[in-house]
Amino acid sequence: AHVGNGGSIAAVDHGKCVDTSMGLTPVEGLLMGTRCGDVDAGALSFIMEKEGLDGHGLSDLINKKSGVAGLVGGSSDMRDLEAAVEAGDERATMVLDVYNYRIKKYIGAYAAAMGGCDILVWTGGVGENQWATRRVVCENMEYMGMKIDVEKNEGMRGEEMVISTPDSKVTIIVVP
């Protein structure tokens, strides 16, 4: 899981990438800092008509004015979003919930398609530094053998570290 201001999930089988959350462009997939991620194709023509956009205007909207920044109505920086959540901002809480849900959804989908998961690698700005996102995404994944060590996860700073419990069937690792 490479998550930061941009982000993608890749399914890797024996060292070969067999699927990725990004499509022809990086817009498909996860909710990102300024990119919308997966969106109903019918919504695009609706937005174009409603907002009077041409193709370039729509591209600008979904690449530069959507995602976390568009939903929260401000910054795309996850540190700002987490600070707003800690301050009790309900909209920021909803945005962070959506952000985390989309990551979990892709991990679960790829694990199902591949018949399981052996290792989950976290990288990118959020993957490396936001212990709360790692915790929330890995919570309730015990059914597939994934158990996060809460203390290791929260104590991890700037170094490669395994953050799964010793009895976890899935190795969870952070790689800066």
List each language-model region with its residue ranges.
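Glycine-rich phosphate-binding loop of actin/hexokinase-like ATP-binding domains
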Residues: 1-49
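Conserved active-site and cofactor/substrate-binding residues in soluble primary-metabolism enzymes
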Residues: 4-7, 38-42, 53, 57, ...
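Hydrophobic alpha-helical scaffolding
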Residues: 33-37, 48, 71, 96, ...
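Oxyanion-binding "anion nests"
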Residues: 48-74
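Adenine-nucleotide phosphate-binding core of ATP-dependent small-molecule kinases
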Residues: 60, 67-70, 78-113
